[in-house]
């Protein structure tokens, strides 16, 4: 009987075992058919953002939803590998893709909770999920991950799987992969971190938000210390290393885009171009754009423009700040702040510096308002609380700042208008009151604070290679994050006297020469186009009589230029201007053209002056030299374009020679500070000084500076191209002067040098000081 029962039990057992095997086999076959190919991982392209670089490989900008930089296994620090193993899968290098003990723990949690939860996955299974099966939490996905893990282990090495893992994982704050995480949280390469920092990053995959050191430093610290303990228990680190790392504070901070060069205006222009050419995929395809920008020139351009605009701004006084009292209910915050301040002062907690306001104060509206304001460089907004003895102000980060009156605030005379200021202040209450919104500036050297203001005046600076049009530096305004409007490429201010060289070049092409006399005398025009009487004058208010064209251009004489335009012909000048890149139909058709009522962007103006710098060739400005895909293959490279000869090289040479003279004794004589004789330049000031210019150049670099307001208004009666724009150009050039080559060009054939009398412009045989040598086109020699 027992034998029969045993046979029955055996048959039943075999049946159920066969049934289980059949079920497992069927499930395996079903899942296998549903599984993606493990080999596809190699073909899956990680989303890598668009990156923009200077010509010397410095990062300008990065655009994309995800910040990611791939890293190879060989470049991963050994202690970081150990930190990841301690946190995620300490048996990774020994198992075949699946941890059975981990799966049992996961199954136990499912039975206890009744819910499908995460956990129990090896690094290999996580790679399968991250790359192939998705992020949903389900039993079916977990089973797929198990099957795929075995396949992955049979195809790839452990090192390759680990590399897949660390380059794909999300680690919070848009950081994907360990290379980006180290830059986001520590501003450093992964190889340059320490054990405590490696452990912190290794703890992020479990909960990139909840255990983020920026969002929740307490939980992040607990997670990090648990990983360090695991590393010590697994003999990954020594006791001394553990003791040192466990005591380390949370040192993570948010490091935004680690651009090495401040060029947001240009990077935004290139971003728009890339989206237009390549679509939205440009944000994730890992394209790298290499520009013509020179990092050294760009950095100098940014600092020179900021300094120049701030200098102008301070010359014209301290503008009355916006007062916020009216925006809030009466005594909404000042009574509360006064109470808080009295408590701080009574306990001697408020030294010259700052103290913190507790979170329980009803000031959230003010904090929100201040934090919504865009900071500028090292300047930040504060709300004035008191100006009785000191300036006491509240910032958006809940800090109270107190500043004594410094002698350096003599500039802060109250602004009345562009030509008038009030009396020199002696204390803060002379210029401020409670509720004022003002800006403080932190000194970059000693971190001291001072009252400042954000300039309303704007400007731009563009520097290009005159021989090929490559843009070497471009700044489109005071601060991109305060105003994204790119004045270097998108604005078209009136040129003022910056147009005169183009007029004089037309005259030389039309038979005039540099010694031709034009009378500098008062004149009234009945100009039908202007529909009024027009009484132009020189900026000096004086008249100089018969004047050689060279002298007229050197000194930027308005009346000579107007008469010259009338003699040459307005239509001829308009048509000839296309040789410098102008659109003739866009130019005014009246005599005001002589004084620069033509408009041109600073970028195009630099290109126009390049015609004088390069011997008469018109170049087309460009930014991009090449575009490289994620594999390093060049998908676009700008071919060398030979510029078209649009102006007689002799004419270009003579105009350049005249503008070189202007640089040491004319309106641009401040250029003599450079101690170089090969630079040429021209100032420009429009009517009422609404736009001011300076464009200076030699054979190798052309730089154009514009200063004005976005909504045109006078810069002031004492402001000219020589006071507002030229100092910016000089500050830009001075650091570069030692490395910039000197001119090598010689007078072109067909140009002759003849001695002439300074007053008459005619040939001179004498040796007196009244004679000079002048260049002439051989067909336009004087009598």
Language-model region placement:
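N-terminal type II signal-anchor transmembrane helix
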Residues: 1-53, 91, 111, 312
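Non-catalytic, structured segments within soluble enzyme domains
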Residues: 25, 115-394, 564, 578-579, ...
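Short active-site loop at a secondary-structure junction
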Residues: 69-74, 419-429, 454-459, 482-502, ...
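Active-site SXXK
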Residues: 84-85, 231, 301, 389, ...
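Short, well-structured active-site flanking segments
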Residues: 93-103, 176-179, 238-241, 508-528, ...
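Conserved catalytic neighborhood of penicillin-recognizing serine enzymes
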Residues: 112-137, 191, 258-262, 467, ...
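A penicillin-recognizing enzyme superfamily signal
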Residues: 291, 295-304, 311, 344-376, ...
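Mid-domain, small-residue-enriched loop/turn segments at the edges of structured enzyme/sensor domains
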Residues: 531-537, 569-607, 620-623
